[in-house]
């Protein structure tokens, strides 16, 4: 890692001096058994592509000017996450469904850092995801409509209550002796 990635205070902190909050398991700390429910997502549209050797994973990357990206986000009144999610969904729609049509929705998993939502300082892995599900239409859909649908789902799903239910489901399986 590059030395500039850390603040002077972080570099001065000796290894092994973590606080209890930094090493606490956020999943178990915020586990509420009564909130458990089963999560079932509808079948999603599958992108087809070249098969990789030995089941390898393909990762697409892109570089873009941050100022231009932020300007686009402001134009739509969206966060960067909302804008990029809408752009990916719209790209899938434009590329694959305009010519073929599809019966299944576009489904995008968006990773979410749970630390600010639950107010925890754990340095352990503490994340979940929200699933944005967009039904596909057989007609042209403007980007603005996709953006509004994405923003609406972010507002509905990016809540503490939603993630408490997911944590109860996930951490519950860890506490279940049969699993």
Where are these regions (language model features)?
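Gly/Ser/Thr-rich phosphate-binding loops and adjoining beta-strand/alpha-helix segments
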Residues: 45-115
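Sequence-level detector for tyrosine residue identity
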Residues: 6, 15, 27, 31, ...
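Generic structural signal for individual residues within well-ordered alpha-helical segments
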Residues: 6-7, 12, 70, 84-85, ...
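Short acidic/histidine-centered micro-motifs embedded in hydrophobic/aromatic stretches
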Residues: 3, 86-89, 169
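Acyl-thioester-dependent acyl-group transfer interface
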Residues: 61, 70, 93-179
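Alpha-helix initiation/capping motif
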Residues: 7, 12-16, 65, 79, ...
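Non-catalytic, low-complexity flexible loops and terminal extensions
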Residues: 2-67
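Generic detection of long, well-ordered alpha-helical segments
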Residues: 13, 17, 21, 82, ...
